[in-house]
Swiss-Prot record:
<keyword id="KW-1048">Host nucleus</keyword>
<keyword id="KW-1078">G1/S host cell cycle checkpoint dysregulation by virus</keyword>
<keyword id="KW-0922">Interferon antiviral system evasion</keyword>
<dbReference type="GO" id="GO:0003700">
    <property type="term" value="F:DNA-binding transcription factor activity"/>
</dbReference>
<keyword id="KW-0010">Activator</keyword>
<keyword id="KW-0244">Early protein</keyword>
<dbReference type="GO" id="GO:0006351">
    <property type="term" value="P:DNA-templated transcription"/>
</dbReference>
<dbReference type="GO" id="GO:0030430">
    <property type="term" value="C:host cell cytoplasm"/>
</dbReference>
<dbReference type="GO" id="GO:0039502">
    <property type="term" value="P:symbiont-mediated suppression of host type I interferon-mediated signaling pathway"/>
</dbReference>
<feature type="region of interest" description="E7 terminal domain">
    <location>
        <begin position="1"/>
        <end position="47"/>
    </location>
</feature>
<comment type="subunit">
    <text>Homodimer. Homooligomer. Interacts with host RB1; this interaction induces dissociation of RB1-E2F1 complex thereby disrupting RB1 activity. Interacts with host EP300; this interaction represses EP300 transcriptional activity. Interacts with protein E2; this interaction inhibits E7 oncogenic activity. Interacts with host TMEM173/STING; this interaction impairs the ability of TMEM173/STING to sense cytosolic DNA and promote the production of type I interferon (IFN-alpha and IFN-beta).</text>
</comment>
<dbReference type="GO" id="GO:0042025">
    <property type="term" value="C:host cell nucleus"/>
</dbReference>
<keyword id="KW-0863">Zinc-finger</keyword>
<dbReference type="Pfam" id="PF00527">
    <property type="entry name" value="E7"/>
</dbReference>
<feature type="zinc finger region">
    <location>
        <begin position="56"/>
        <end position="94"/>
    </location>
</feature>
<dbReference type="GO" id="GO:0003677">
    <property type="term" value="F:DNA binding"/>
</dbReference>
<keyword id="KW-0238">DNA-binding</keyword>
Amino acid sequence: MIGKEVTVQDFTLELSELQPEVLPVDLLCEEELPNEQETEEESDIDRTVFKIIAPCGCSSCEVNLRIFVNATDTGIRTLQDLLISDLQLLCPECRGNCKHGGF
């Protein structure tokens, strides 16, 4: 660079000197577009509305919580496993008594 201001002439770009793994790649060259039948199959995933009644996770509360979800069979089973093992729902009153990150 000569002078106080940068000009386009100050930059020289030598793409031929780049390593093969750094060279630009046409991102569409290896892409396969799904046909219409595959697209329809993806949109036809069966979802069902479920009503879930679960007790509040706080030991001193006796409130039953009711939530509604729209899920696949796999999704509702995963949620059921979480509710049985690691996940506990809290009512708004018990949530107000909790601190962020724990009780």
